[in-house]
């Protein structure tokens, strides 16, 4: 997924990903 790359640039995206799961 594209947001996997963003995880490195945007640590806050990790929170969003946790909410998705």
UniProtKB/Swiss-Prot annotation:
Signal peptide: none
Domain of life: Eukaryota
GO molecular function: actin binding
Post-translational modification, as annotated: The N-terminus is blocked.
Protein keywords: Actin-binding
Coiled coil: none
Function in brief: Binds directly to F-actin and induces actin filament bundling. May function as a regulator of actin filament organization.
More info: On the 2D-gel the determined pI of this protein is: 7.5, its MW is: 71 kDa.
Family per similarity comment: To yeast fimbrin.
Protein name: 71 kDa F-actin-binding protein
């Amino acid at each position: 997924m594209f947001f996997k790359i963003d995880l490195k640039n945007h640590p806050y995206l990790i929170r969003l990903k946790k909410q998705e799961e």
